[in-house]
Amino acid sequence: DINGGGATLPQALXQITGVIT
């Protein structure tokens, strides 16, 4: 994660959303 954008999402999606956000 860049900004930990997936706090309520699974860690796999957290990594993806961390890059997007």
Swiss-Prot record:
GO biological process: cell adhesion
Localisation: Secreted
Extent of the signal sequence: none
Keywords for the protein's UniProt record, in alphabetical order: Cell adhesion, Secreted
Keyword Amino-acid biosynthesis (UniProt): no
One Gene Ontology cellular component: extracellular region
The keyword Secreted appears for this protein: yes
Regions annotated as coiled coil: none
Protein task: Plays a role in adherence of C.albicans to buccal epithelial cells, and in biofilm formation.
This protein's name: Complement receptor 3-related protein
Organism of origin: Candida albicans
